[in-house]
Amino acid sequence: MGSSAVWVFLTLEMIIAVACCLGNVLVIWAVWTCGALSQPTFCFIVSLAVADLLVGSVVIPMAVLVDIGMNTSFYGCLFICCIIIMLEVASVALLLAIAVDRFLRVHIPLTYKSTVSKKRSWIVVALCWVTAALLSFIPMFGWHNPLRADSTECRFFTVISYSYLVYFIFFSLYLPPLALMTGLYCYIFLTTRRQLRANIGVATKSCTYYQKEHRLAASLVLVLVLFVGCWLPLFLMVTVRLYGPHIEVPSVAVDIGVLLCHTNSAVNPIVYAFKIPKIKEACRKLWRRVYHDREQQQSEQNNTQNNTDRNKNSNAENARTKDNSTENRSATQQPVL
């Protein structure tokens, strides 16, 4: 890319980073304040928000340093790239955990609470992160591009092997979970729709339960679709580079693919805030509180200003009264000629 294109790219990266940090901190705060962390699904959502927050606070700043020409050792660059891969693998694992949780919620509604406890859900979250770390740091043990020099200009595709990205990440850790999640959500929608049709015109707890599950599943499917839409273009371009080395994939297209991947971490909080009722209500309460505090602060400032003005007017009136009294006494005390 030319220098102007590089600066446009870096500016967009920084905007996305700020959006990632602000949005995901808001989501984590909203889930925390509304007390939803006791529910397994929200444990997974918060963990996914943490992964997105790390993209904005760690990955994108590293990418910016790389793009402005930071030099580092080969294995230092490889370590940074493995962290980037780890967050993507962790996101896939957490999305799969959310899909399985929603499946169990619909498949075993009567025994769900005893089967999926808060403790077990956090154990699953920990397993997702540990597994992602173990699988993502495989390049550190040999599956990487040949070592070219003791120091290098750090570029992702300079150190990470296309074969590792395509065969291991894309074909093994991306497509199979995606197919499984698609099947689980299809089952969820078919089951909830069948239950709702069976209870048409009947206001029961069962009907309310399945309506709630259907709406939440639809919101989470949107998160999944956005994830696929943002990450798939980059994976496809990498696959083309592996299988068709004679086919030129423009570097600008790859950079746009990277931007899309990072954008996904900034878009998720918007989906949570507008589509998931508990998070939406918590965000509304936060907005009301901020707006109310601002109004109250403005009102206090106005009252203080009014009191100050009244005191000034009162002091001025007292001064005028005192001057008039002094003049009257002086006139009275003058001798009559």
Please give the residue ranges for each predicted region.
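Alpha-helical transmembrane segments of multi-pass membrane proteins
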Residues: A17, S47-V59, V124-S136, L173-Y174, ...
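Extracellular TM2-ECL1-early TM3 structural module of rhodopsin-like
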Residues: G2-M14, P40-V100, R105-T115
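Loop architecture of class A 7-transmembrane GPCRs
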Residues: G69-I85, S114, K119-W122, T131-A179, ...
